[in-house]
């Protein structure tokens, strides 16, 4: 049931009676109250229970004044004050009562509730625990404690004793990992998954707390033949209990843990900022403690908390600390600090830049803490990515270099780019060496995807590289990276492609950042996995376990407004939301319409337009619906094969200000009193697109046809709807790959794609299908991602409507949608065959349209299932990993 943790309920006399029956010696010595005080006390509780709080407060004050030594009058006064939002005075009353008698469960409950209101969760848990110890039947308080700290009633585990000998369960040897087994050390190739845990509707810090859920996930990963799971940050105690439970019951199929230590960027890019660095090191100690089942973390916003009593150290492969540091932060830190050396107990750096030196210190700090506290060591690395790799990339000019080449070539300057500099500075794990006191070793960890940065695709040496399966620029990059780190393992700690409809970055071999249906995603992920093995990497950890709706990427982030609400809806145009092995899909699985699926689901959609003649040869019915991903349109047509060779279908959609927009349709020439922002033109199954009025097109996707230069274009502002009567609609192209210069002046043209291209087919055939015409049932079915219609947040019914030229994009509240359907005859002189609403003298009257609106939501509906990538990697991971020799084409010489 739902329970408000701030609700103040009256104490129950039954709790006190139960305690006194068991412990009569606890009965406090109470001064009998005179009749006026007793009457006031009784009247106070009567008013309290009838929600007359102000009357109750007056009665309790009177009773307490007349009988100040009686605990019951104080309890009543405290609860009445609390319910009147006088939290501080109420807390003082309860503390005073407990100072007089520490066995009063009602006073402890009151103290728990006031502490919670005052923001002291630890004190609230302590007081609540004391209250239910005295009154075990207090179900409401138990539920409150379950919310605050699910393990509040678990017995405290004894602190682990420090072993006398060094505990070593994993280590690095050359370019590989090894784990200890009953028969000694054996090579270990980590093949696993990054565990993101933010369910739809939840922030990334709102972790599931149910051990059964984590146990189910681990069981699924094990069935996939994964042997490793990586976490970025501290998860709730339930995860570690589930991991220990799985591994103790499946010792031959243990899942090893790679644990991260998360942090944000430091203030002013100062990694030596005292408070920030202290917090980072506190987090390191916490991770070490919880891995050994010896941590208690108090509640804090955005952080897992509780008693971590599950020792998972026997299966913790190593640590990966930090995050993908932004290059501007590393550059600023290096510029402000001198180079230096570091000689720690377990790691050394003979000479290096400030950031490399800092990383060595932090990793050594964590190893030293684990050794001192638990006499244990394990391999450690810091998070790195190609943007900060130690290699040199001739095709990746810096901003200064690119500006120089632009001036020399006469191209002019570009607009401000929305991107980091991807080869301006680097971090080199080779600079750090383990000492003789460190038998666990050291490794390099990279997040490496095939489609970014652009040097992955532009470098001629990478482009010539071939794995055993054929050309692979990704394989070329990995091979050079592994060759650079000849003495240590290279773990690819993130890789993969998403099953999103939208694309954020194009790849010439088709391994793009999005734009894959789920079958294609499975095939690409399997190929990348094989390339990683063959390139000589020490392991591969796929990104990610499940789709996480809160994520966002550069190409859509400005249009997801408010950004805080992305967790409430699923944007299929946002590549970052769709990497999961476990897909998280909008709506109720039992009722959500599916392209080519149960026709009854489409026919249950609300009716918006209906033809007067139900037997017309044209469109008979328009229906609309919605879920957390899509705007659905169903159009009932005669049940017969549609003649695409001679006819086409247009759907005109008004999303905002019905009197404003485009009042004439192209091809058909239909005019309308209603203005439209969008047009869907279905020419034939292999040629269908969404178009937008020019003023409402949010992207400037112009590329010079002669040079391929985009001049840094991306966004168009303002983005509004205006009256037009010229039939013009724009395509929904967006620039995904900006034009670039190499360091030698080589030019790489910009790339773009049409977001509005619609794919025909059933959902069973392709998860990125947009529309399907069921000829047999006579039902045209469309599902349009909200983002394609410039809906910035469907949960609050918010649209893009930007009258600004800079700053944040503007929005407006959605009113009603209106839609009309036209069947037109193709040819040199297109003609209208039929329309709904019906035309009057070749035009639509505003009175002929019926508006449709959807309701917002605060809690999304969703369902989940495994994607095909589960099966493709399950089969791949069942085979023993091979380490084929790296074969690389020589790098093409640079000018």
Residue ranges and their predicted role:
Residues 652-677, 790-894:
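Acidic/polar low-complexity flexible segments
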Residues 153-220:
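N-terminal carbohydrate-binding accessory modules
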Residues 611-738, 800-824:
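Surface-exposed, glycine/proline- and aromatic-rich loop segments on solvent-exposed faces
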Residues 502-510, 515, 520, 531-608, ...:
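Aromatic-rich peripheral "rim/lid" segments of glycoside hydrolase catalytic domains that contact
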Residues 49-50, 83-84, 117-118, 147-152:
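Register position in tetratricopeptide repeats
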Residues 210-282, 362, 366-373, 467-468:
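Aromatic-lined substrate-binding rim segments of carbohydrate-active enzymes
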Residues 288-318, 323-511:
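Noncatalytic carbohydrate-binding groove/subsite architecture in carbohydrate-active enzymes
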């Amino acid at each position: 049931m739902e329970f408000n943790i701030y609700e103040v309920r009256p104490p129950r006399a039954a709790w006190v009676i139960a305690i006194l029956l068991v412990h009569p010696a606890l009965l406090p010595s109470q001064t009998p109250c005179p009749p006026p005080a007793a009457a006031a006390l009784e009247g106070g509780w009567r008013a309290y229970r009838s929600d007359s709080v102000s009357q109750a407060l007056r009665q309790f004050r009177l009773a307490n004044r007349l009988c100040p030594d009686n605990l019951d009058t104080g309890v009543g006064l405290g609860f009445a004050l609390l319910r009147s939002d006088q939290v501080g005075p109420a807390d003082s009353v309860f503390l005073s009562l407990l100072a007089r008698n520490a066995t009063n469960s009602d006073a402890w409950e009151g103290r728990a509730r006031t502490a919670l209101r005052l923001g002291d969760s630890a004190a609230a848990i302590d007081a609540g625990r004391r209250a239910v110890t005295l009154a075990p039947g207090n179900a409401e308080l138990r539920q409150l404690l379950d919310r605050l700290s699910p393990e509040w009633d678990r017995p405290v585990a004894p602190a682990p004793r420090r072993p006398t000998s060094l505990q070593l369960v994993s280590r690095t040897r050359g370019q590989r990992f090894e784990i200890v087994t009953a028969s000694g050390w054996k090579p270990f190739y980590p093949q696993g998954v990054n565990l993101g845990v933010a369910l739809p509707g939840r922030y990334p810090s709102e972790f599931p707390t149910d051990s059964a859920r984590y146990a189910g996930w681990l069981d699924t990963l094990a069935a996939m033949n994964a042997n490793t799971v990586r976490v970025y940050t501290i998860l709730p105690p339930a995860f570690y209990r589930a991991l220990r439970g799985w591994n103790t019951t499946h010792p031959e199929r243990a899942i090893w843990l790679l644990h991260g230590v998360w942090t944000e960027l430091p203030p002013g890019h100062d990694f030596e900022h005292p408070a920030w660095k202290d917090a980072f090191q506190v987090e390191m100690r916490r991770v070490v403690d919880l891995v050994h089942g010896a941590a208690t973390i108090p509640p804090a916003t955005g952080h897992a908390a509780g008693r971590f009593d599950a020792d998972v150290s026997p299966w913790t492969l190593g640590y990966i600390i930090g995050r993908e540091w932004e290059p501007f932060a590393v550059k600023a830190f290096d510029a402000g600090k001198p180079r230096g050396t570091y000689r720690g107990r377990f790691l050394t750096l003979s000479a290096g830049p400030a950031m490399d030196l800092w990383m060595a210190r932090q990793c050594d700090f964590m190893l030293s803490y684990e050794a001192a506290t638990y006499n244990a060591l394990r391999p450690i690395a810091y998070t790195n990515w190609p943007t900060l790799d130690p290699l040199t990339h001739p095709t990746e000019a810096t901003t200064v270099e690119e500006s120089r080449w632009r001036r020399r070539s006469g191209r002019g300057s570009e607009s401000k780019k929305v991107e980091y500099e991807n080869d301006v500075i680097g971090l080199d794990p080779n600079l750090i060496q383990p000492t003789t006191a460190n038998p666990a070793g050291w490794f390099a960890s990279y997040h490496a995807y095939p489609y970014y940065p652009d040097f992955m695709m532009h470098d001629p040496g990478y482009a010539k590289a071939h794995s055993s399966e054929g050309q692979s620029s990704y394989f070329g990059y990995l091979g050079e990276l592994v060759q650079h780190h000849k003495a240590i393992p290279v773990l690819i700690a993130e890789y993969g492609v998403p099953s999103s409809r939208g694309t954020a970055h194009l790849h010439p071999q088709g391994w793009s950042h999005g734009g894959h249906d789920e079958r294609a995603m499975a095939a690409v992920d399997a190929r990348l996995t094989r390339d990683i093995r063959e390139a000589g990497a020490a392991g591969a950890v796929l990104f990610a376990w499940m789709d996480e709706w809160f994520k966002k990427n550069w190409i859509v982030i400005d249009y997801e407004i408010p950004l805080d609400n992305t967790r409430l809806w699923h944007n299929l145009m946002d590549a970052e939301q769709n990497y999961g092995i476990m897909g998280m899909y909008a709506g109720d699985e039992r009722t959500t319409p599916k392209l080519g699926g149960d026709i009854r689901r489409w026919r249950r959609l609300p009716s918006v337009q209906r033809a007067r003649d139900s037997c017309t040869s044209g469109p008979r019915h328009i229906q609309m619906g919605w879920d957390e991903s899509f705007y659905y349109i169903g159009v009932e047509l005669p049940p017969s094969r549609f003649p695409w060779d001679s006819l086409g279908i247009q759907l005109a959609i008004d999303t905002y200000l019905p009197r404003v927009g485009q009042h004439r349709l192209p091809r058909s020439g239909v005019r309308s009193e209603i203005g439209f922002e969008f047009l869907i033109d279905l020419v034939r199954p292999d040629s269908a697109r969404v178009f937008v009025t020019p003023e409402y097109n949010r992207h400037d996707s112009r590329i010079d046809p002669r040079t391929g230069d985009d001049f840094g274009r991306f966004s168009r502002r303002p983005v509004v709807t205006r009256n037009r009567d010229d039939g013009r609609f724009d395509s929904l192209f967006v620039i995904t790959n900006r034009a670039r210069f190499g360091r030698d002046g080589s030019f790489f043209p910009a790339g773009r794609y049409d977001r509005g291209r619609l794919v025909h087919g059933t959902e069973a055939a392709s998860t990125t299908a947009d529309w399907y015409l069921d000829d047999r049932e006579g039902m045209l079915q469309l599902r349009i991602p909200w983002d394609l219609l410039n809906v910035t947040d469907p949960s609050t019914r918010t649209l893009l409507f930007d009258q600004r030229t800079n700053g944040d994009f503007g929005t407006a509240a959605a009113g009603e949608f209106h839609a009309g359907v036209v069947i037109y005859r193709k040819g040199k002189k297109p003609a209208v065959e039929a329309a709904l609403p019906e035309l009057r003298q070749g035009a639509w009257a505003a009175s002929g349209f019926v508006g449709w609106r959807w309701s917002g939501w605060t809690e999304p509906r969703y369902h989940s299932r495994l994607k095909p990538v589960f099966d493709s990697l399950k089969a791949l991971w069942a085979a023993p990993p091979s380490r084929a020799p790296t074969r690389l084409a020589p790098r093409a010489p640079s000018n």
